[in-house]
Amino acid sequence: MAGNSIGQFFRVTTFGESHGSALGGIIDGVPPSLPLTEKDLQYDLDRRRPGSSRYTSQRSELDTVEILSGVFNGKTTGTSIGLLIKNTDHRPQDYEKIKNLYRPGHADYTYEKKYGFRDYRGGGRSSARETAVRVAAGAVAKKYLFNKKNIKIRGFLAQMGDVHCNLKDWRQVNNNPFFCPDLEKLTALDTLINNLQKSGDSIGAKITVIAENIPIGLGEPVFDRLDADLAHALMSINAVKGVEIGDGFSVITKRGSEHRDEMTLDGFNSNNSGGILGGISNGQPIIMHIAIKPTSSITVPGKTITRENEETQVVTIGRHDPCIGIRVVPIAEAMVAIVVIDHLLRQRAQCEKI
């Protein structure tokens, strides 16, 4: 299987399956002498991990990360950093009854048609469980970016179903299980999730990520544009079906006189472009939105086919999220951080004195 790595100067490779013994990864390109401990990575892993609230999957993984290499006496050495996260609450027996059929909306069908064989235990490699290592790698990137350039990368739940969450207070995002910055919407979110859990259904979400203090000049025209790489990274997250940067699809109804970001000696008058012009960062905050589909692992019966090409019904058994978007926030932050640090290192290599 190809496609297990992302990045050029800062390169992340992951391995492992949902119900295998462990997940792991290798990070190449981390600059030396960055203070780093497992505690630095664990914070974001705890934000992502399942079983952390009654609103998410009750699979109870501690997601304890172990740094195997690349760190000595509390600092990075500049060599490859090896990471390991053991699976401690995997239950492959939950999938025995559905191993010979394809779960609609999942990668079961496409994986088997592509490879001729698949790991049916929770989706194997296609499971969002894989993203735990991405979050750990992203934590390394976030620490370097903040320490060296004061770059902040933060995300929040912008919408779940019909409930819209306004960015009122960043401080509240990590103080509630929804990553919601709008405390007035917590009751509505709670009601929505409770109703979904009772009905056995799920719902989609919109996540917003904002990267601040980005220096001007990150991005490599033409094919490695910063926005192209960000879209690539965000689309690689399980269940993401759409990416917007800046005004995104709302530009369809706007006039050029309205959308262009006019400039004065004091700076830009607006940020409709989302901080990127011509594929290169312009110094403004980079604003991204992603659409998360509702998980297909639900207890509502659905039509499907078996490996023997017979029609049947499926009712998903196991522990699943009524809204996977709740746990995507730290994953999206991680992917943005991985792209930003990669382009920062590329810029330093090519244009250090500029």
UniProtKB/Swiss-Prot annotation:
EC no. given is 4.2.3.5
**One Gene Ontology cellular component annotation held by this UniProt entry:** cytosol
- Binding of FMN occurs at R125, S126, S127, N238, A239, G278, K293, P294, T295, S296, S297, R319
Q: How is the cofactor bound?
A: Reduced FMN (FMNH(2)).
Write out the pathway annotation from the protein's UniProt entry: Metabolic intermediate biosynthesis; chorismate biosynthesis; chorismate from D-erythrose 4-phosphate and phosphoenolpyruvate: step 7/7
Listed GO MF terms: chorismate synthase activity; FMN binding
Cofactors named for this entry:
FMNH2
Q: Does the keyword Flavoprotein apply?
A: yes
Reactions performed catalytically: 5-O-(1-carboxyvinyl)-3-phosphoshikimate = chorismate + phosphate
Q: List, alphabetically, the HAMAP family matched.
A: Chorismate_synth
Tell me which family the UniProt entry assigns to this protein: Belongs to the chorismate synthase family.
Protein name in UniProt: Chorismate synthase
Naturally occurring in which organism (per UniProt) = Blochmanniella pennsylvanica (strain BPEN)
